[in-house]
């Protein structure tokens, strides 16, 4: 995009009540695409992520990374004067994004019905660990909690050991992306109909989208297939995963129609006709 070209979301204003990672990822995507994002930080300390990853000049690189291009204002949300400022901002915004525990926005009289009284076509995106409704809704949670509930944790690590966790924010970031896409769709819907939306985006729901085959294998087989952890390897395809080699660890993804190519690269074409090596299922047993 050239310097003089208008950004995709120029003219869209987002009021951002989010902290940590999932919510800030959602609003950062809007900021990166040219929307005006106004981040509300709770006085007196501001966003708590300002206190971590202080690598240089006493500034949090975590906070910088996940809040790029945003404006910021520190407001005491427990003070009537602070809430008055918030209520002045809302009619001027297209979107409100929050990731408080479900019920907190209602406690501040900032739930969707209240927001609609201030701006009839407002779009509210509520991001939480376990959803806005249902038996788990009132429980607080983080990425790894939702990951465990979803069954994803059970698929990471070696089958004969306890599950592991990935040291990256898979759930938070993917939930932020889901939220941003939902808001973009709501903006399109509003342009067509004049109506706003309340979007319920949960880490738990988004984690289910990360199950490539586990859920449908188990449900489709009537429970006969029990997906298991495969350690360094994909549990149902081979070769697929990390393998030890003379020069160090390598990543191979040569299953199905790529198997002949790998055999040729290894100068092992005899494996193409060798019993026990013909299908992915046969090769999985041998890895």
Language-model-detected regions and their locations in the chain:
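N-terminal helix-loop segment corresponding to the beta1-alpha1 unit
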Residues: 1-195
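Glycine-rich beta-alpha junction loops
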Residues: 44, 130-131, 203-208, 247-248, ...
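Short Pro/Gly-enriched beta-strand edge/turn motifs at strand-loop
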Residues: 46-48, 221-227
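Active-site-adjacent beta-strand anchor residues
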Residues: 76, 98, 201-204, 252-255
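Conserved Rossmann-fold dehydrogenase catalytic segment
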Residues: 132, 160-170, 191-207, 228-235, ...
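Oxidoreductase and adenylate-handling cofactor-binding alpha/beta cores
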Residues: 154, 176-197, 209-222, 263-273
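C-terminal substrate-binding/catalytic lobe of Rossmann-fold NAD(P)-dependent oxidoreductases
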Residues: 183, 234-237
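Aromatic-enriched alpha-helical interface/lid elements that frame and gate functional surfaces
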Residues: 238-287
């Amino acid at each position: 995009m050239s310097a003089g070209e208008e950004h995709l979301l120029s003219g869209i204003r987002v009021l951002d009540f989010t902290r940590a990672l999932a919510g800030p990822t959602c609003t950062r995507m809007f900021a990166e695409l040219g929307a005006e994002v106004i981040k509300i930080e709770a006085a007196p300390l501001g966003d708590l992520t300002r206190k971590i990853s202080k690598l240089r000049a006493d500034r949090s690189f975590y906070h910088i990374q996940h809040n790029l291009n945003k404006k910021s204002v520190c407001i005491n949300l427990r003070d009537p004067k602070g809430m008055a400022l918030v209520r002045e901002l809302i009619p001027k915004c297209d979107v409100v994004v929050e990731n408080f525990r479900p019920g907190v926005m209602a406690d501040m009289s900032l739930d969707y019905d209240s927001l609609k009284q201030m701006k009839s076509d407002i779009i509210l995106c509520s991001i939480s660990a376990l959803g806005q409704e249902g038996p788990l809704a009132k429980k607080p949670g983080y990425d790894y909690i939702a990951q465990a509930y979803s069954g994803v944790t059970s698929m990471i690590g070696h089958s004969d050991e306890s599950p592991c966790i990935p040291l990256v924010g898979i759930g938070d970031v993917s939930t932020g992306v889901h939220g941003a896409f939902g808001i973009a769709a709501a903006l399109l819907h509003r342009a067509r109909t004049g109506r706003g939306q309340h979007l319920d985006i949960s880490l738990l729901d988004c984690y289910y989208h990360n199950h490539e085959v586990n859920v449908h294998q188990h449900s489709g087989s009537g429970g006969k297939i029990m997906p298991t952890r495969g350690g360094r390897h994909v549990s149902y395809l081979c070769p697929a995963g990390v393998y030890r080699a003379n020069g160090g660890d390598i990543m191979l993804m040569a299953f199905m129609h790529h198997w002949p190519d790998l055999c040729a690269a290894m100068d092992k074409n005899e494996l193409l006709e060798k019993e026990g090596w013909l299908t992915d299922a046969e090769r999985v047993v041998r890895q």
